Amino acid sequence: MAVLSAPGLRGFRILGLRSSVGPAVQARGVHQSVATDGPSSTQPALPKARAVAPKPSSRGEYVVAKLDDLVNWARRSSLWPMTFGLACCAVEMMHMAAPRYDMDRFGVVFRASPRQSDVMIVAGTLTNKMAPALRKVYDQMPEPRYVVSMGSCANGGGYYHYSYSVVRGCDRIVPVDIYIPGCPPTAEALLYGILQLQRKIKRERRLQIWYRR
């Protein structure tokens, strides 16, 4: 067996075999290129692509961009969800609000009134009779408002997809921002969905869009 050696290091034996069994294999650096006889070896390395954010065109747009960052920071740090538990997924939603996961440390506080909420968590099976109530609660929420679809039943009907009394996805009634798969999804999955919603809010540019009109 060959002896492995690196520059600056002494050769060592493997499994007690002598170095005379085979030729020594020199360790190659990570960034060293392999020399080949083909024409591709003479081609220069391509530069890495860099995503450069567009610079503000004026001072006013710069101020508006900073205001957007400030508003988005305050908005994503104080999400107040409206509980809309419809089935077994609501148990995991309550589990996330319990001390084990402590959702309050992310600024997420459940509210009982839709007029004080900016997030709706649709947890469970949405039936045809419950659909008008869901839309009514959504219309009572102030702007900007977000919807989290929790579980397979809320996403697309789930186990009751072919039932005559079930809406095949709550996105047919209200616009959905975050989909959380699972039957039911765990509390960790719901918490991850809330964190993804915070990332989405961070990238919003509502004031810049208003300023450019």
Swiss-Prot record:
Biased composition range(s): Polar residues = 33-44
InterPro entries recorded: NADH_UbQ_OxRdtase-like_20kDa (IPR006137), NADH_UQ_OxRdtase_20Kd_su (IPR006138)
- Tell me how this protein sits in the membrane: Peripheral membrane protein
Report the subcellular localization: Mitochondrion inner membrane
Would you kindly state one Gene Ontology biological process term found in this protein's UniProt entry?
electron transport coupled proton transport
Which controlled-vocabulary keywords does the entry list? 4Fe-4S, Disease variant, Electron transport, Hydroxylation, Iron, Iron-sulfur, Leigh syndrome, Membrane, Metal-binding, Mitochondrion, Mitochondrion inner membrane, NAD, Oxidoreductase, Primary mitochondrial disease, Respiratory chain, Transit peptide, Translocase, Transport, Ubiquinone
A Pfam entry, by short name? Oxidored_q6
The cofactor binding remark recorded in the entry reads: Binds 1 [4Fe-4S] cluster.
Any single GO molecular-function term of the entry would be:
metal ion binding
Instruction: Cite the post-translational modification comment.
Output: Hydroxylated at Arg-111 by NDUFAF5 early in the pathway of assembly of complex I, before the formation of the juncture between peripheral and membrane arms.
Reactions the enzyme catalyzes: a ubiquinone + NADH + 5 H(+)(in) = a ubiquinol + NAD(+) + 4 H(+)(out)
Query: What EC number is given for this enzyme?
Result: 7.1.1.2
FT transit peptide: 1-38
Hydroxyarginine occurs at: 111
Binding annotation for [4Fe-4S] cluster: 88-89, 153, 183
Q: Which GO terms describe its cellular component?
A: mitochondrial inner membrane; mitochondrial matrix; mitochondrion; neuronal cell body; respiratory chain complex I; synaptic membrane
**Which residue stretches belong to region Disordered?**
31-53
Q: This protein's superkingdom?
A: Eukaryota
Q: Which cofactor does it need?
A: [4Fe-4S] cluster
Q: Indicate the disease this protein is implicated in.
A: Mitochondrial complex I deficiency, nuclear type 3: A form of mitochondrial complex I deficiency, the most common biochemical signature of mitochondrial disorders, a group of highly heterogeneous conditions characterized by defective oxidative phosphorylation, which collectively affects 1 in 5-10000 live births. Clinical disorders have variable severity, ranging from lethal neonatal disease to adult-onset neurodegenerative disorders.
Q: Which NCBIfam families match?
A: nuoB_fam (TIGR01957), PRK06411.1 (NF005012)
Its function? Core subunit of the mitochondrial membrane respiratory chain NADH dehydrogenase (Complex I) which catalyzes electron transfer from NADH through the respiratory chain, using ubiquinone as an electron acceptor. Essential for the catalytic activity of complex I.
Q: Which family does it belong to?
A: Belongs to the complex I 20 kDa subunit family.
Task: Quote the subunit structure annotation.
Answer: Core subunit of respiratory chain NADH dehydrogenase (Complex I) which is composed of 45 different subunits. This is a component of the iron-sulfur (IP) fragment of the enzyme.
HAMAP family found in the cross-reference section:
NDH1_NuoB
- Protein name according to UniProt: NADH dehydrogenase [ubiquinone] iron-sulfur protein 7, mitochondrial
What is the organism field in this record? Answer: Homo sapiens
